[in-house]
A protein has these predicted regions:
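Long amphipathic alpha-helical tracts in eukaryotic proteins
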Residues: 1-182
Length: 182
């Protein structure tokens, strides 16, 4: 089922729940609050699902804007959007990873076309790779090796090497914290 279909289904469910809530509230007595609480709880679940779908859709659009960038200016603008999403919290970083953002950033990092944007690409990766899902995706696409090679590349500019080292340090710190937590 596509996200539009799920969105419509959730919207219809919320409309029905609101109707049920109105009917129940008009008939409720203090001793019969359980049905009302059940409806409100289900409404909250629907609302959470709708918000998640809407956020996911917006994040997907932002990741797509990175992929479709035709110029360095467009790419820098799109990377700024992804970075701002990442700074909003871990949940949005997970959504960026879910929509292939980490994979895309690593692909662009290895492209000679986007060589002038390597620092920004690394900074964006560092922002997004603050959650386990993003780190796993980074490992799956061999991004760790790509970034490690940049750290050791004497031909790379110093700011790029510093950004690359920062991504690796953050990723290792998060991995160690996660493993010690488990």
């Amino acid at each position: 089922m596509g996200s539009d279909e799920v969105l419509v289904k959730e919207q219809q469910k919320m409309q029905k729940l609101l109707h049920d809530l109105k009917v129940s509230a008009s008939r409720v007595r203090s001793s019969q609050l359980a049905p009302l609480v059940e409806i409100v709880t289900e409404f909250g679940t629907c609302l959470t699902t709708l918000v998640e779908l809407m956020l996911s859709s917006k994040v997907e659009q932002v990741v797509l804007s990175v992929q479709q960038a035709a110029s360095l200016t467009e790419l820098e603008t799109a990377l700024g959007r992804v970075t701002r999403l990442g700074l909003e919290g871990n949940h949005l970083c997970r959504l960026v990873a879910r929509h292939g953002g980490v994979r895309l950033l690593v692909e662009m990092l290895t492209s000679t076309k986007w060589l002038p944007a390597r620092g920004s690409l690394l900074r964006t990766l560092g922002t997004v790779c603050c959650v386990l899902e993003a780190i796993r995706q980074l490992e799956e696409v061999r991004g760790v090796e790509v970034i490690a090679r940049l750290v050791g590349d004497s031909g790379a500019r110093e700011p790029e090497r510093a950004e690359a080292a920062g991504v690796l340090a953050q990723m290792n710190d998060l991995t160690i914290r996660y493993e010690s937590f488990v």
